[in-house]
Design a protein with these regions (language model features):
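Aromatic-lined carbohydrate-recognition surfaces of secreted/lumenal glycan-active proteins
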Residues: 67-77, 133-134, 156-198, 251-264
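Active-site-adjacent "subsite" loops/lids of carbohydrate-active enzymes
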Residues: 1-2, 58, 75-126
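Catalytic domains of carbohydrate-active enzymes, especially glycoside hydrolases
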Residues: 6-32, 123-132, 206-210, 276-284
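Active-site-proximal loop/short-helix segments
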Residues: 31, 38, 78, 83-84, ...
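Substrate-binding cleft of secreted/luminal carbohydrate-active enzymes
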Residues: 208-222, 234-302
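Aromatic-lined carbohydrate-binding/catalytic grooves of carbohydrate-active enzymes
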Residues: 17-52, 141-143, 147-148
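Glycine-rich, aromatic-flanked loop segments that form ligand/cofactor-binding clefts
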Residues: 21-26, 49-98, 133
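The substrate-binding groove and active-site-proximal loops of carbohydrate-active enzymes
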Residues: 1, 38-52, 101-115, 152-160, ...
Length: 302
């Protein structure tokens, strides 16, 4: 599917269904910034790949009254890590910056990395987004023992670094009129600590307006929630995960899961959605290719 066909498909979904929100990449997993920014760091990184501007957002809103979310990837940034090596996590065994499956992580305590991301978030907000959504707002999900950080890698430092960044972002972005959300791993709804990545449910919820746990059935290990193959039980797995979060005190209004829009049939995707809606929750749906079926969604009456 080419870009024009894909965009036409999304426009059809917007006009024919009850979908009212779009999540749009502002800074991607590969470190590219997709709008014209005044950040001095981008002059060094040469990472601008301009795809849209404020006028583009206004054109989208002409389709319908859309709520627009800018997705900004935070601590996974190969361009920043390779350019400013002193801001990246170091691999002492191989004497180089740390990488995990071609992903390069910045040290979450790096002030330069934090300031850079926050400056982009403020600019995206000023351009016309309603909300800034931070993704990869975490430490690497790895037990690799040779990672070297600026600070000792323990629960307190991890959660402090994640929550302090989000708290600073929330304060700055609220002043600009934007709400703030964080994408978190689905298992964080169940795990009572931080999963080794700095995401603790009880503390992170205080630092943002919304959390979007990625409760993808395909990402749960065999046996999770009592199901040998969780991916075969989308409704039950999503429902159980969300129950864990709600039972731990997350307000319904703040719990807005990311649902699985890949590797599933239309019926399975609709089960994901039904599980969230049965708990009176708003939701987002994720497909890395931005390919969505019209039949996932509730159609508007003609």
């Amino acid at each position: 599917m080419n870009k024009e066909t894909k965009m036409n498909s999304i426009k059809e979904i917007l006009t024919k269904t009850n979908v009212n929100t779009l999540v749009i990449d502002a800074k991607t997993d590969n470190g590219h910034v997709l709008f014209d920014t005044q950040s001095s760091e981008t002059d060094i990184l040469k990472n601008e790949r301009i795809k849209y501007d404020a006028a583009t957002l206004e054109e989208l809103r002409k389709i319908k009254d859309l709520y627009l979310i800018a997705r900004i990837v935070v601590f996974q940034d190969p361009l920043f890590a390779k350019t400013f090596k002193e801001e990246a996590i170091f691999d002492s065994k191989n004497n180089r910056i740390y990488s995990q499956n071609e992903q390069y992580f910045l040290d979450p305590s790096s002030q330069r990395a934090r300031d850079y991301t926050l400056s982009l978030a403020v600019e995206a907000c000023q351009m016309g987004f309603n909300e800034i959504q931070f993704d990869y707002i975490r430490y690497p999900d790895s037990t690799y023992q040779y990672m070297v950080f600026k600070e000792k890698n323990n629960y307190l430092n991890r959660t402090n670094n994640i929550n302090s960044f989000l708290g600073e972002a929330k304060e700055a972005l609220h002043k600009e009129g934007c709400l703030v959300s964080a994408d978190i791993f689905g298992f964080i709804l169940t795990n009572t600590e931080d999963g080794g990545i700095g995401q603790n449910l009880e503390t992170i919820i205080e630092s943002v307006d919304f959390i979007s746990p990625m409760v993808y059935p395909s990402h749960y290990s065999n046996g999770s929630f009592g199901y040998q193959y969780p991916n075969n039980h989308p409704y039950e797995v999503v429902s159980a995960a969300l129950n864990d979060g709600l039972e731990r005190g997350v307000p319904e209004i703040q719990l807005r899961p990311f649902l699985q829009g890949f590797w599933h049939s239309i019926a399975d995707v609709k089960e994901n959605i039904e599980a969230a809606e049965d708990k009176n929750l708003d939701w987002l749906i994720w497909n890395i290719l931005s390919t969505y079926e019209l039949d996932y969604f509730t159609k508007l009456e003609s």
